[in-house]
Amino acid sequence: MKTKWLISVIILFVFIFPQNLVFAGEDKNEGVKVVRDNFGVPHLYAKNKKDLYEAYGYVMAKDRLFQLEMFRRGNEGTVSEIFGEDYLSKDEQSRRDGYSNKEIKKMIDGLDRQPKELIAKFAEGISRYVNEALKDPDDKLSKEFHEYQFLPQKWTSTDVVRVYMVSMTYFMDNHQELKNAEILAKLEHEYGTEVSRKMFDDLVWKNDPSAPTSIVSEGKPKRDSSSQSLQILSSAVIKASEKVGKERENFVQTSEELGLPLKIGSNAAIVGSEKSATGNALLFSGPQVGFVAPGFLYEVGLHAPGFDMEGSGFIGYPFIMFGANNHFALSATAGYGNVTDIFEEKLNAKNSSQYLYKGKWRDMEKRKESFTVKGDNGEKKTVEKIYYRTVHGPVISRDETNKVAYSKSWSFRGTEAQSMSAYMKANWAKNLKEFENAASEYTMSLNWYYADKKGDIAYYHVGRYPVRNSKIDERIPTPGTGEYEWKGFIPFKENPHVINPKNGYVVNWNNKPSKEWVNGEYSFYWGEDNRVQQYINGMEARGKVTLEDINEINYTASFAQLRANLFKQLLIDVLDKNKSTNGNYIYLIEKLEEWNNLKEDENKDGYYDAGIAAFFDEWWNNLHDKLFMDELGDFYGITKEITDHRYGASLAYKILNKESTNYKWVNVDQEKIIMESTNEVLAKLQSEKGLKAEKWRMPIKTMTFGEKSLIGIPHGYGSMTPIIEMNRGSENHYIEMTPTGPSGFNITPPGQIGFVKKDGTISDHYDDQLVMFAEWKFKPYLFNKKDINKAAKNVSALNMSK
């Protein structure tokens, strides 16, 4: 991959060829100056922050109003009013787990003055454009509003905060404790208590000391290998898990149809001055939130006296998550810390609306919600639902037959507005101390990254993490009777963090932050086989690195067959032991060693370049089935997400590598299983496709931006151009913090402007970054005024006093 050539070509194109500037709107010297670059990205210049944030909301609404409206409705639970009863269950879950307007307003009232004022101004900016659009709907309302025959509403601070809190809560939310309990209960029924617990401890380990970490430290923690404190749960947990699981599947499906972001992942890297080839700190961002058109991320430049920042953030958020200000670059990835607990509530046999807590029967809080639902005939009806809440949180399942209910607690509950404020403060910070102060106020589980002009870097696993009762196993639900409540929260200073690490860099792909840190029910995310090794390997293979080096590492990670990292060498070693018995084994060894472990298509012929990749894919699937299908039998389906997880297959590696496990998973030599899979797959490929690997090449898998439909029509009308599938960030920023400020390159596909005219015409910037993204080309990261003016295509002004 000729990344340096590609990067230089696009930057050369942007800066050498003159732009035809268009001056539009009011006098460009008044109000907020809006400079649109040649990719449609708005760079806002205001005389004060209030005007700046109002303009921020305005341009976002101008570019993405329909998307904003979908986010608002999706998060407040009013989608069924527009799209009918199929979306009522999604609305119900949004209301069940959400807050009332009164509760949100109370949180906003508790914020510091500046964040509170600027959130309000951001909302005013959105409403300003809504007012304009309602006066001129034919020109200023995008086609979707006309198509579905409804109008946007004005926004308030409550809407802005709700969009943030509900979407971020979903990223932190899970019901894995119920799923784990279901797995354990079914294993116990089949194998008995002793054997099932050994199996469970292998499937959902507490702490894997071999797991790669973002903070490199000496020594290893002790491995937790037994379930000495497993609490006894009701048999009703199986039914509850299945019910909640189906509800969540429906929620995910309908949310994706509406174009709401659900996928959360992300990778990032920061490099300090000692590891950087230029001596300047470097930062890479790769948020993974899915691929749709318009995208979930919105790029903008913000400029006011004493404040300059450029980057991207989620649509509807009044802050930048991936970018830089004058002093430092910042990024974030999902932390996957243990911030969600499920509590098993014991119900009163005489009154199922009461639950036992600290020796007394308590009444559940009861709340009625009304939904306006559009019928098939277009008429609207009112549907009323009753929701219950315990001291632990909303009731997500209630089994009156077994007198058990399950409620859900989030450690950050009630502090979401504070977290939004903390992110805004991080944007405004001028040094590491101020950034760290903002990080200390953030209560949801993320990883934050910092790289400044001095060459310093820092990493924080931010969030508010409970101190749980030591008698409780965090992997399954907690009895809600009051004896096992949280004892407080871990102090921020004890959260994993590092400043200027000795190895000179920090990388993360949602992996374990540090050796001692565990994440309860999601412990199987952090194992010995983990995808972050792609970034670690790339960094360790190089001395000092540049942004181009980091881009090459990201390219490798995006196309890697992740199982090849550990399992390919295991296969080669076993083949080498048996090569004298079959000449095909020598051939396989040669091809495996030649293979770069990537599933790429550099010659653009529609097939993966390496035929051996087809062999390895099929070998892995065959091998995985042999390891677990017989032992787990009927439970293979509910455990496959763990044993063949997208982050890694650690249990399989431990078995095949003959490491210690609690349960004996195979009764034959591991090498025999490896060879059986090899022989079966080799015979199949050679008989069906030919003797040599060149004949085994597979058609590439493709992806599109916006393949999920919105009631039969692509979300935002999508962009159906297929490109090769990549395990890559939804956008990428590569930033070098030079002594004079940030520079670098970035890409935010498919494009900046999601507005579609009433007649179906799309903007030139609807998907103009899509092909670039597919070809690993980038646009220059524009920060200083001189470069922005060179790339300017349109200049206008917004008068905030009107």
UniProtKB/Swiss-Prot annotation:
Phenotype when changing residue 224 to E: In strain: CA4098
CDD domains for this protein: Ntn_PGA
Catalytic activity: a penicillin + H2O = 6-aminopenicillanate + a carboxylate
Cofactor: Ca(2+)
Signal peptide: 1-24
Keywords, sorted A to Z: Antibiotic resistance, Calcium, Hydrolase, Metal-binding, Secreted, Signal, Zymogen
Gene Ontology biological-process annotations: antibiotic biosynthetic process; response to antibiotic
Active site location: 266
EC number from the UniProt entry: 3.5.1.11
Record-listed Ca(2+) binding positions: 177, 341
Propeptide: 235-265
Superkingdom of the organism of origin: Bacteria
Compartments in which it is found: Secreted
Gene Ontology CC annotation, any one: extracellular region
Cofactor binding note of this UniProt entry: Binds 1 Ca(2+) ion per subunit.
Any Pfam family matching the protein: Penicil_amidase
One MF term in the entry's GO annotations: penicillin amidase activity
InterPro entries in UniProt: Ntn_hydrolases_N, Pen/GL7ACA/AHL_acylase, Penicillin_amidase_A-knob, Penicillin_amidase_dom1, Penicillin_amidase_N_B-knob, PGA_C, S45
The protein's assembly and partners: Heterodimer of an alpha subunit and a beta subunit processed from the same precursor.
Membership in a protein family: Belongs to the peptidase S45 family.
Protein name as catalogued: Penicillin G acylase
Organism: Priestia megaterium (Bacillus megaterium)
